[in-house]
Swiss-Prot record:
Any one GO CC term of the record: cortical endoplasmic reticulum
Protein name: Sphingoid long chain base kinase 4
Pfam families: DAGK_cat
GO biological process terms on file: calcium-mediated signaling; sphingolipid metabolic process; sphingosine biosynthetic process
Keywords: ATP-binding, Cell membrane, Endoplasmic reticulum, Endosome, Golgi apparatus, Isopeptide bond, Kinase, Lipid metabolism, Lipoprotein, Membrane, Nucleotide-binding, Palmitate, Phosphoprotein, Sphingolipid metabolism, Transferase, Ubl conjugation
Organism of provenance: Saccharomyces cerevisiae (strain ATCC 204508 / S288c)
GO molecular function: ATP binding; D-erythro-sphingosine kinase activity
Topology versus the membrane: Peripheral membrane protein
Broad class of where this protein is predominantly found: membrane
EC number of the protein: 2.7.1.91
PTM (free text): Phosphorylated by the cyclin-CDKs PCL1-PHO85 and PCL2-PHO85. Phosphorylation is a prerequisite to ubiquitination. The phosphorylation level depends on sterol composition and may also be involved in subcellular location. Ubiquitinated. The ubiquitination leads to degradation in the vacuole.
Binding site for ATP: 234-236, 266, 298, 324-326, 392, 398, 589-591
Active site as annotated: 293 (proton donor/acceptor)
Length: 624
C-alpha cells in the first residue's frame, strides 16, 4: 500500500486533524451515514462517562470503525501518547507499509501476571491527553498490524515511501469508548508538521521541538506528565472487586499515558495508614487509592503521622480511583464513578490544594488527632452508615435503607453544639459561595471554549488562571500549617455560638463536610468548595413531620434539600459537639468514631489532590 493511502493528518490548535486523501469511513454497505462524522467528533471531545445518545449519532454493531471519518479531529484531551515510527523497522516489511495500517489496536487487556501480590509497572513512553464520553459501541477492531517500536525511535523519512521533509510517521495512542468505559487505542498517522509560529502567525519565537513533543506538550498542557504513582488496593473492599476493576479498567489508561506504577495491596485493617507512614516519598508524586473512601482516609492520616509530614504533604497528591462501595472522593473530584474515566482525569488534572478537617476527641487527642477529607456525622446518618456495614455487599443502597428506617422510627439524638460561624444564614452562605467558587480555580480546563470559527464540540482548550501559582509551589506548607487554632484542651472560645437547645435536644441529622457528594446520587453538600476555608454544616431535627422529611430526603440527589426552610445550612470554621446519649457513634469519612465530645476545625489547603478543571463537580448550587 502506498503512503498516500495512509491516514494523513495535520496538527492543529485543537488536536490532530485526520485529512486522508483517499479514504473515508463507510459502513459495510458503502455509505457514510449522515451524522456519523459529527457524532464521533463529539464523542472524542467530551469528557463524561455516560454514553452518547442522539438521533443517528450512535453506531450499529455492523458498522466498520477501522477508519476515522474524514476531517475528524482527535482532540488533545483524548490523546494519551505519541511516538515516532521508524518506517524501516521490522513490521513495515522492509520499508513497505503493512497491508492494513488503519486498524486500531485494543490495549485494554491485562497482563497475565496481574495476580502478583506486589509488583511494579513502568512504561517508558511519553504521555499525551485527557477525555470524557463516547457513543455506545463495543466492537472496536482488536486485530492489529500496528508497528511495535521503542519510544526512542527516531523518524525515518524514507524517500521510497514518499514521506516529505515536513511529515512524520507517528503512532498516536488515544482514548476511545468501549461500552461504558474508555480504553486506549493506537493509530499510525502521517502527520504534516506545521510549526507553532506558522499556525499561530503571532510572531512569537519559533520553538524547534519535534512534532511528538509538541503533541505531548499540548495534550498535557499545565498538567504533570509521567506521574510516579503508588496504587493502594484493598482487594476485599466493597464488593470485593477493587483489584479487578483497577487492573482491567484503570491501569491500561495509566500505563499508556506513561505513568510509572507500583501496586500495594492492603492485608489487614488500617494497613494503608502504615503504608503511607512508612513509604519512601522520594519514589512517588501521587498516591492513587483504588478503593472506596476508606483508603484515602487512611493514607491522609498515615502521611499526617510521619516525622516528615511537611515534606509528604508538599510532595504527594492523594487521589481516588473509584473501586469501592462509596466513591465520594472520585465523584466530587473526578466527576465520575467510573474507574477508567477517573484514570483519564487523573493523568490530565493539575494538582490542587484542598482543605482538610482536624478531629479531636479525649480518647486520642494526646496521641494523634484525626484528619478528615470528607465528612463527620452524628445521628441518623452516622447510624445508617456504620450500622449497615453488615450489608455492605449491597453497595450504596444500604445507606438509603438505613436512613429511611431511622427516619420512620422518629429517632432523635440530643447533644450540645458550639459553632464558629463563617456564614450563618442561607443568604450569607450564598454570598460566600459566589465570592469563593472560583477562588482556587487554576487547573486544567477540560471543557470546550468555542471560538468564532470553530464548532464548540471540537474544542478543548487548556487554560489556566495563574492566581494559584504561588499556592502550588513545592514548599507551600510548613509546620505551622499543622498547628491547631482551637485545641480541645482549651475552653470553648467566647466568639463561638451555642446552638439553640430546643434544636439540638431534638436533633436528627448533624452532618458536616468538605465535598459535595457523600455517595453516588447523594449531593449532600452542594455548596462545598475545595479551598474556601470553611466546613459545610447541615442540621435537621425530629420535630419535622415525616410528610416533610420525605421530600427533603428525596431531593438529596439534586442537592435542593438545603433550600428547605426546615433544614439548617451554614458555613463554619470549627465546632464542638457533646452527645447527651449513652449509646451511639460518630462517623468520620465512613469510619466509626467513639461516642464522646468531638471538636473539629478547618485545616486550610493542607492536602494536594487532583481536581478535574481545578474544581469540584458542578452541583448547580449557584442557580438554585
Amino acid at each position: 500500500m502506498v503512503v498516500q493511502k495512509k491516514l494523513r493528518a495535520i496538527l492543529t490548535d485543537e488536536g490532530v486533524l485526520i485529512k486522508s486523501q483517499s479514504h473515508h469511513m463507510f459502513n459495510k454497505h458503502g455509505q457514510l451515514r449522515s451524522g456519523d462524522s459529527l457524532s464521533l467528533l463529539s464523542c472524542l471531545s467530551c469528557l463524561d462517562d455516560g454514553t452518547l445518545s442522539s438521533d443517528g449519532g450512535s453506531f450499529d454493531e455492523d458498522d466498520s470503525l477501522e477508519l476515522l471519518p474524514l476531517n475528524t479531529t482527535i482532540p488533545f484531551n483524548r490523546i494519551l501518547n505519541a511516538k515516532y515510527v521508524n518506517v524501516g523497522q521490522k513490521g513495515f516489511n522492509n520499508g513497505k507499509i503493512s497491508s492494513n495500517p488503519f486498524q486500531t489496536e485494543n490495549l485494554s487487556s491485562s497482563s497475565e501476571n496481574d495476580d502478583v501480590e506486589n509488583h511494579s509497572l513502568s512504561n517508558d513512553k511519553a504521555p499525551v491527553s485527557e477525555s470524557q464520553s463516547f457513543p455506545k459501541k463495543d466492537k472496536w477492531d482488536t486485530k492489529t498490524n500496528t508497528v511495535k517500536v521503542s519510544p526512542d525511535d527516531s523518524q525515518d523519512n524514507s524517500p521510497s515511501l514518499g514521506i516529505k521533509d515536513n511529515q512524520q510517521l507517528i503512532e498516536l495512542t488515544f482514548a476511545v469508548p468501549k461500552g461504558h468505559d474508555v480504553i486506549p487505542q493506537k493509530l499510525t498517522l502521517l502527520i504534516d508538521h506545521v510549526s507553532r509560529k506558522s499556525r499561530a502567525n503571532t510572531g512569537e519565537e519559533n520553538i524547534s521541538s519535534g512534532t511528538v513533543e509538541e503533541i505531548l506538550e499540548k495534550s498535557y498542557e499545565n498538567s504533570k506528565r509521567n506521574r510516579s504513582i503508588l496504587v493502594i488496593i484493598n482487594p476485599h473492599g466493597g464488593k470485593g472487586t477493587a483489584k479487578n476493576l483497577f487492573l482491567t479498567k484503570a491501569r491500561p489508561i495509566l500505563v499508556e499515558s506513561g505513568c510509572k506504577i507500583e501496586i500495594a495491596y492492603t492485608k489487614y485493617a488500617r494497613h494503608a495508614i502504615d503504608i503511607a507512614k512508612d513509604l519512601d516519598i522520594s519514589k512517588y508524586d501521587t498516591i492513587a487509592c483504588a478503593s472506596g473512601d476508606g483508603i484515602p482516609y487512611e493514607v491522609i492520616n498515615g502521611l499526617y503521622r510521619r516525622p516528615d509530614r511537611v515534606d509528604a504533604f508538599n510532595k504527594l497528591a492523594v487521589t481516588q480511583l473509584p473501586c469501592g462501595s462509596g466513591n465520594a472522593m472520585s465523584i466530587s473530584c473526578h466527576w465520575t464513578n467510573n474507574p477508567s474515566y477517573a484514570a483519564l482525569c487523573l493523568v490530565k488534572s493539575i494538582e490542587t490544594r484542598i482543605d482538610l478537617m482536624c478531629c479531636s476527641q479525649p480518647s486520642y487527642m494526646n496521641e494523634w488527632p484525626r484528619l478528615s477529607f470528607l465528612s463527620q456525622t452524628y445521628g441518623v446518618i452516622a447510624e445508617s452508615d456504620i450500622n449497615t456495614e453488615f450489608i455492605r455487599w449491597m453497595g450504596p443502597v444500604r445507606f438509603n435503607l438505613g436512613v429511611a428506617f431511622n427516619i420512620i422510627q422518629g429517632k432523635k439524638y440530643p447533644c450540645e453544639v458550639f459553632v464558629k460561624y463563617a456564614a450563618k444564614s442561607k443568604k450569607e452562605l450564598k454570598v460566600h459561595f459566589l465570592e469563593n467558587k472560583d477562588k482556587n480555580k487554576g487547573c486544567l480546563t477540560f471543557e470546550p471554549n468555542p471560538s468564532p470559527n470553530s464548532s464548540p464540540d471540537l474544542l478543548s482548550k487548556n487554560n489556566i488562571n495563574n492566581s494559584t501559582k504561588d499556592e502550588l509551589s513545592p514548599n507551600f506548607l510548613n509546620e505551622d500549617n499543622f498547628k491547631l487554632k482551637y485545641p480541645m484542651t482549651e475552653p470553648v472560645p467566647r466568639d463561638w455560638e451555642k446552638m439553640d437547645s430546643e434544636l439540638t435536644d431534638n436533633l436528627t441529622i448533624f452532618y458536616t463536610g468538605k465535598m459535595p457528594y457523600i455517595a453516588k446520587d447523594t449531593k449532600f453538600f452542594p455548596a462545598a468548595l475545595p479551598a474556601d476555608g470553611t466546613i459545610d454544616l447541615v442540621i435537621t431535627d425530629a420535630r419535622i413531620p415525616v410528610t416533610r422529611m420525605t421530600p427533603i430526603l428525596l431531593s438529596l440527589d439534586k442537592g435542593s434539600h438545603v433550600l428547605e426552610p426546615e433544614v439548617i445550612h451554614s458555613k463554619i470554621l470549627a465546632y464542638k459537639i457533646i452527645p447527651k446519649v449513652e449509646s451511639g457513634l460518630f462517623s468520620v469519612d465512613g469510619e466509626k468514631f467513639p461516642l464522646e465530645p468531638l471538636q473539629v476545625e478547618i485545616m486550610p489547603m493542607l492536602c494536594k489532590t487532583l481536581l478535574r478543571n481545578g474544581r469540584y463537580i458542578d452541583t448547580e448550587f449557584e442557580s438554585m
